[in-house]
């Protein structure tokens, strides 16, 4: 039965309030308006950022449908949409690409000004929602909201991919691209260099893969879960360190082991202390640190300017510096086995098991859970 132009009733995991489990609900998804795309979600990953919203580390309005790392099929399109058509396989983009703002026109940034990461409206461009539940509008997350069987996104926030792409390609929508790109695009790791990756979760593992792909000769994985060390070594880390094993700051240990510090550090843990350790673990004259983790909005880096004055640099990175137009190439590379994302998948669940996925994430078990719809 054709559903284009009609409301769709489907299942979704709704976060009614912070610090509470998600609730599996029946919601209504309105048809896409002009320059919008309605997508049938096939699979979605569970990212630490989703958990950070629930913990109020990332500000959001409630009730909200979380999720931003997915793959799906276009169900219908609104007026004026030319980039995709019904039936196309796509990845929603939490960092859109309008093509006309300063960031989109620059080769130095991928942070499109039409993103909803800063505005925090939780609404579409016309300031309304496409989701309703129990008679109430439900907010979206960064313009994507993938913990639902159907979602609506702007046409600038969708990447068409190979129709044969496996469901695991959903991880290119955030986790893999974020870590991998931080190494190859943002840090610009060079052949023969030394690297340290702080935080051995999905993003950290992807950063290790990126460092290895860029030709780093030494990659130090840093984490407190020793059960993650074998996977880190398998992916390219040359050694792993647990800060709890030392009676001195881990940056001092790393500097002692690397003749004054590594060339590049990537921070994926989201803790102020870890960010400072990452920065101080780099060589004073030229070290580059990339911060990916999200700390509490009430916390600030206690930064001594002297750490930067000598030549270090501190950078941030979102979605690994990739623009939306590059996502299809990443999927193609994955299908050609030039890159691999399968190592991220530790558990496959269904939408009604979503709270179990969050429990696994919070406990540090596994790497990444994906939900198959």
Curated annotation (Swiss-Prot):
Entry's Gene Ontology cellular component terms: cytosol
Gene3D superfamilies: Medium-chain alcohol dehydrogenases, catalytic domain, NAD(P)-binding Rossmann-like Domain
One GO term (biological process): retinoic acid metabolic process
Keyword Oxidoreductase: yes
GO molecular function, one term: all-trans-retinol dehydrogenase (NAD+) activity
Alphabetical keyword list: Acetylation, Metal-binding, NADP, Oxidoreductase, Zinc
S-S pairs: none
The protein's name in its UniProt record: NADP-dependent alcohol dehydrogenase
Species name: Pelophylax perezi
Gene: ADH8
